[in-house]
Amino acid sequence: MIKLEGVSKTYGAGPTAVHALKNIDLDVPQGAIHGVIGLSGAGKSTLIRCVNLLERPTSGRVIVDGQDLTRQDAEALRQSRHQLGMIFQHFNLLASRTVFDNVALPLELMGVSKSDIRERVEPLLDLTGLTDKARQYPAQLSGGQKQRVAIARALASRPKVLLCDEATSALDPQTTASILELLQDINRKLGLTILLITHEMEVVKSICHRVGLISDGELVEEADVGDFFTAPATRLGRDFLNAFLELEPPQALVERLEETAGPHTHPVVRLAFSGATVATPLISRLARDSGVDVSILQAKVESIQGRTLGLMIAELIGSPDTTSRALTQLEAHDINVEVLGHVQRDA
Amino acid sequence: MSSAMLELILEATLDTLYMVALSGAVSALIGIPLGVLLYVTRPGQILAQPFAQRVLAIVTNIGRSIPFIILMVAIIPFTRLIVGSSIGTNAAVVPLIIAAIPFVARLVEGALNEIPPGLIEAAQAMGATPYQIITKVLLPEAKGGILNGLTITVVTLVSYSAMAGAVGGGGLGDLGIRYGYNRFDPLIMLITVAILVIMVQGFQSLGDHLVRKADHK
């Protein structure tokens, strides 16, 4: 549904040029919720704004529903934009219009008749739970309600794609959850393809099917959300995940961690297991079969996109032989093992 | 005070109102589109024309820097061309309009400046044409600010119109100078000033009321 091919965006020229996006390829299938996560300044915003050409890419193609938007003239692009709803971090509602009239705006722009506007706006207000707020002005609404208005407005032109630019970043956690639920609901009911950018892992975890990680203008990693949460492929991915899960080894241990194994060290590992392995009595079996002692430092179970994910940080205490056998055994059970370092015994 | 005097005062008041209303309406009619043009042709804006914008901005600034009393005298030939005379209330309206247009334009531009850029972006994302952005987003969103600017303009026009009295423009300023100053009649002077004060208060209250009604923030 959305396809970016070799999209680059450069601001300025020469040695002071800023390469906001570097050769981005992205393919979001019909009906998917695709998240792009990254730190601020990584190019997320530029990326999503390139999809509806609010920013024109310096090079590359943007194809939405089979149409190459980068080749369209101004009029054709305006028509295409009716297919692309967009919501923003700061809602961008018109203060001078009531809730109803804000939602009606895209229809007015398309030249829809007054009676048809009423017919199309009312179900949207119903869908977003705003029917009783129709006559109010945005200033009278809470942040969550404003974003609901923005969502209703974005859906008014019956788009095929919804672009969400940090749509929940200005909202508190509870409101965020309700907005995410609404987006998921829309995705299911209307089959709408959603591309969202965010810096919040919570958003990715709650509703995304796939996630891309953007860093310094490059898409450095892309995976199904379940896989990303089990085993991020990049350092940045792991940093995001660990910060989100608050799954860091205790500070006192971190200070003692050594990068290489010695004759008297034992490994500290981060284990991630998903699906059926979560239910198995893994650690006690490991201790029994390989003869290592396992000291659990942190553990947590998360549910991501219907998949259960177990995460653990543990010290494997035993001789180098037994610990390496334990590691092999863990990997044989389809457990993602990351050795964080080694600590001296009896330290 | 004689009834002739009262009649004179009434006539002068109506003359002033006429000058202010006519010059206010015409300068709004021309100044608002000019202010919009100054805004939308800026670099990076929806109808960016950086060079034309620059020229327009300079012309506007020149218009604003000429003192009204000088402008009034300087454009007498132009005024005569338009209304056929260089004295009287109609003749005073011409320089008032010329002076107020750039004033209104800058105030409108300032009001448009207050609109969050995200709103224009949202409208663009909805597929709005530049004309639709102006009529459906910019003008309605800046309505309060524009009304505020027009109120300031009208109040300024009240005092400018009094200045127009100096060149035989009629109105309260004319009355105040001829009777109050030249004939040294402090009562007439006081009355004309009092009427001007009341007029300004009235326009300001009306303007404030309209701004409040337009504002949903």
Swiss-Prot record, chain A:
SUPFAM superfamilies: ACT-like (SSF55021), P-loop containing nucleoside triphosphate hydrolases (SSF52540)
Location in or out of the cell: Cell inner membrane
Family the entry assigns: Belongs to the ABC transporter superfamily. Methionine importer (TC 3.A.1.24) family.
InterPro entries (UniProt xref): AAA+_ATPase, ABC_transporter-like_ATP-bd, ABC_transporter-like_CS, ACT-like_dom_sf, MetN_ABC, MetN_ABC_transporter-like, NIL_domain, P-loop_NTPase
Alphabetized UniProt keyword annotations: Amino-acid transport, ATP-binding, Cell inner membrane, Cell membrane, Membrane, Nucleotide-binding, Translocase, Transport
Residue ranges of every copy of the ABC transporter domain listed in the record: 2-241
Its job: Part of the ABC transporter complex MetNIQ involved in methionine import. Responsible for energy coupling to the transport system.
Subunit structure and binding partners: The complex is composed of two ATP-binding proteins (MetN), two transmembrane proteins (MetI) and a solute-binding protein (MetQ).
Enzyme class: translocase
Binding-site residues, ATP: G38, L39, S40, G41, A42, G43, K44, S45
Membrane topology label: Peripheral membrane protein
Catalysed conversion reaction: L-methionine(out) + ATP + H2O = L-methionine(in) + ADP + phosphate + H(+); D-methionine(out) + ATP + H2O = D-methionine(in) + ADP + phosphate + H(+)
UniProt xrefs under CDD domains: ABC_MetN_methionine_transporter
Organism for this UniProt entry: Chromohalobacter salexigens (strain ATCC BAA-138 / DSM 3043 / CIP 106854 / NCIMB 13768 / 1H11)
GO cellular component, one term: plasma membrane
Its EC number(s): 7.4.2.11
Official protein name in the record: Methionine import ATP-binding protein MetN
GO MF assignments: ABC-type D-methionine transporter activity; ATP binding; ATP hydrolysis activity
